[in-house]
Amino acid sequence: MASMVSFCFLLLFLAFFASSFNEIYAEESESKEFVLTLDKSNFFDTVSKHNFIVVEFYAPWCGHCKKLAPEYEKAASILSSHDPPVILAKVDANEEANKELASEFEVRGFPTIKILRNGGKIVQEYKGPRDADGIVDYLKKQSGPPSAEIKSIEDATNLVSEKKIVVVGIFPKFSGEEFENFSALAEKLRSDYEFGHTLDAKLLPRGESSVSGPVVRLFKPFDELFVDFQDFDVNALEKLVEESSVPTVTIFDKDPSNHPFVVKFFNNANAKAMLFLNFTSEVVESFRSIYREVAEKNKGEGISFLIGDTESSQGAFQYFGLRDDQVPLIVIQNNDGTKYLKPNLEPDHIASWVKEYKDCKLSPYRKSEPIPEHNNEPVKVVVADSLDEIVFKSGKNVLLEFYAPWCGHCKQLAPILDEVAVSFENDPDVLIAKLDATANDYPTNTFDVKGYPTLYFKSASGELLQYDGGRTKEDFIEFIEKNREKSSKKESIVKDDQTDSETKAEL
């Protein structure tokens, strides 16, 4: 569930961060199609024949997929002339027959692009651009050697950019256990980082030039600018690279060069502290300075730190249910989705508030829409602040839908649930309800919501079942009748009445 929370959170941030795509022309091309069309029947047979193949999982209704399509086709055309040719393919993951395939490759949204190596034995995420030229450049690098040899200062200058992370191995010779382990690391992490190797540290722009190796040097555009490692265990190297490639404080603003670090921030396993303020305000430098001190003091303590400009952070405000009049503010989110909020923050509050968080002295913050003043529709509206009362403490049999306002399947389901609710309108033991999961927090350890709509049934006695049956009116009614129980509140009232009667009789 933690991965779903992080995944959804990340999407909301990136929706406000990503730069717009180039405008797409709508003319139909009569030229040859270079993108292979795969499905369940030919997927594995095709993939097994290629040492390197790229597969897009798409849905016909997906707007981003439609924007990508001509760029992807153009890239496939160009890469067909590469030596050796780079094959691009696509799978309609909306087709019923291909849904199992999409599930196997952990497709959680569209479009999802995977790089498959060694006949499909190695699967990696595509993490490159989505315009034709960007796709071509990225895949040329990905299809080549995982690490580039640095033979000159020019080679080093071309590889080690001021705005990206690069991992370079320095060796006395390109053989032996250390070099093999470095090569294995480069192969494993090539989708995330660029790698190089050299026999001469003097060619490199930063760091001790007299080192003969073996040493791994990570170059980065923040903090201490480079770090040297000498532990050549692959797992240890990977951990060191991952930890060193996250800034002490990640910057979230409109600068596209910060984008990869924002992604890494949300993908790491730490709790996430996020300070939001107006970057044009007079107090911004005071906040930055103190926040960085706190981040450095808590390094290695399981908390990652980000500072975001309110102008660029509307996705976060939507996700957390925050308001501009609460700025400056700080939020900490655990991987289980629990959140803690300190609005109207002063710089000297930061250190003490983070300490209170670490000492478990803070009360969780819960995002909730207002409880409706009138809730008279057949399907009852549930918000975070009324979830306990309406669902868990009502003593009723409750069918609860978790939905998103933008979800097409949810819109299709809405009139059906209305009909189901009307069918039980005069039944005091049954309630049909809905909760906007994008606007309200809910206990993620109780409800496993991986997509929309997700439905749960809570019986009168409190037993919880996830509904995975059909979606007709008859399907829902049959399920409710099969799993319903007598109202626990009604039984309690009867017992209380009986006790009162017995007491009166004794008197």
Curated annotation (Swiss-Prot):
Highest taxon in the source lineage: Eukaryota
Annotated stretches, region: Disordered: 484-507
Residues annotated as site: Lowers pKa of C-terminal Cys of first active site: R130
InterPro entries tied to this protein: PDI_thioredoxin-like_dom, Prot_disulphide_isomerase, Thioredoxin-like_sf, Thioredoxin_CS, Thioredoxin_domain
Site (Contributes to redox potential value): G63, H64, G408, H409
Record-linked SUPFAM superfamilies: Thioredoxin-like
Gene Ontology terms for molecular function: protein disulfide isomerase activity
Site positions (Lowers pKa of C-terminal Cys of second active site): R471
Glycosylation sites: N181, N278
The protein's role, per its UniProt record: Participates in the folding of proteins containing disulfide bonds, may be involved in glycosylation, prolyl hydroxylation and triglyceride transfer.
GO biological process per UniProt: protein folding; response to endoplasmic reticulum stress
Residues of the active site: C62, C65, C407, C410
UniProt keyword annotation of Glycoprotein present: yes
Protein name in the entry: Protein disulfide-isomerase
Keyword Disulfide bond: yes
Assigned keywords, A-Z: Disulfide bond, Endoplasmic reticulum, Glycoprotein, Isomerase, Redox-active center, Repeat, Signal
NCBIfam families per record: ER_PDI_fam (TIGR01130), pdi_dom (TIGR01126)
Ranges of residues in domain Thioredoxin: 21-144, 365-485
Recorded coiled-coil stretches: none
